[in-house]
Amino acid sequence: MKFNEFLNHLSNYEPGKDIEVIAKEYGVKEVIKLASNENPFGTPPKAIECLRQNANKAHLYPDDSMIELKSTLAQKYKVQNENIIIGAGSDQVIEFAIHAKLNSKNAFLQAGVTFAMYEIYAKQCGAKCYKTQSITHDLNEFKKLYEAHKDEIKLIFLCLPNNPLGECLDASEVTKFIKGVDEDCLVVIDAAYNEFASFKDSKKHLEPCELIKEFDNVLYLGTFSKLYGLGGLRIGYGIANANIISAFYKLRAPFNVSNLALKAAVAAINDDEFAKKTLENNFSQMELYKEFAKKHNIKIIDSYTNFITYFFNEKNSTDLSEKLLKKGIIIRNLKSYGLNAIRITIGTSYENEKFFTEFDKILR
């Protein structure tokens, strides 16, 4: 059977390995997952209670207007409901953006190393990819590439902070760059980890209401999978000019997000204590990862996220990842990104200590 020719140029996305699979494969009783940047404290208590109260409604289709969650987000971000679209994870909104803007006759621009799904979704449409030589977000290089190919480039991805490296840009740098982009080119700001960046440094904070007020060609993406601990429910959102959102709705299937996910998301937003606990733990424990890296002469990039990336010269990331798996510790090997590096999610103090103990033995 023949398939779309664009599939010949695609590779499958490699997700983090599952706890149960590793336990069975390696015969370990305790498995610690520090691979997928999930919340180490699990699901917010208010969301858990909400799910309990609504579990008997799983047979019902959701309210397709999603009015409760939209109104909650609109109040949080000081925008209108018409500026918001809800997706089954923010990656579904990425897919909407790509299908709305890209085809085999145009192109997109991204950092040399960034979230893999941008390229996977875009190549499904046959779009050409322009990448910076720098693995991080070098806006001077972005500007040069855009100016050289602006007739082709119709979509730009800025992952802020960047996954899988963790670096971030000041908000003022971002807005200055966007001012040089034509209105017909959509700038997607993937802010999946921006709550972490904003907590660490207010200069990194991106305010969607200000962005869409100043620019008609900006899409701000948020998710409930990281800070809010709802990765398993698959729910995220996009905020943009009403005309952009209206176009995306033509690509959205009805009932694309479950009623339980919608209810839990509202509860999670209102669980301030859980969010505060998560952020404080993240950056206090991050310091221990920096100290460990310094002790072992491991190169890092200052991270504004809930993960840290370790770069190696002599050691091999695949070998290190395999040795950690044998100890029941799952991290993310970044070989598929062309890097001799591993990405580690910041866990609980117990999980992190277990990582330090076992990795210290491996590195000797």
Swiss-Prot record:
Enzyme Commission (EC) number: 2.6.1.9
Entry-annotated residues carrying N6-(pyridoxal phosphate)lysine: 226
KW Signal (keyword) present: no
Reactions the enzyme catalyzes: L-histidinol phosphate + 2-oxoglutarate = 3-(imidazol-4-yl)-2-oxopropyl phosphate + L-glutamate
Zinc found in the keyword field: no
Necessary cofactors: pyridoxal 5'-phosphate
Highest taxon of source: Bacteria
Involved pathway(s): Amino-acid biosynthesis; L-histidine biosynthesis; L-histidine from 5-phospho-alpha-D-ribose 1-diphosphate: step 7/9
Keywords: Amino-acid biosynthesis, Aminotransferase, Histidine biosynthesis, Pyridoxal phosphate, Transferase
Molecular function terms, GO-annotated: histidinol-phosphate transaminase activity; pyridoxal phosphate binding
InterPro entries: Aminotransferase_I/II_large, HisP_aminotrans, HistidinolP_aminotransfase, PyrdxlP-dep_Trfase, PyrdxlP-dep_Trfase_major, PyrdxlP-dep_Trfase_small
Gene Ontology biological-process entries: L-histidine biosynthetic process
PANTHER family given in the database record: HISTIDINOL-PHOSPHATE AMINOTRANSFERASE, HISTIDINOL-PHOSPHATE AMINOTRANSFERASE 2
Family: Belongs to the class-II pyridoxal-phosphate-dependent aminotransferase family. Histidinol-phosphate aminotransferase subfamily.
Protein name, per record: Histidinol-phosphate aminotransferase
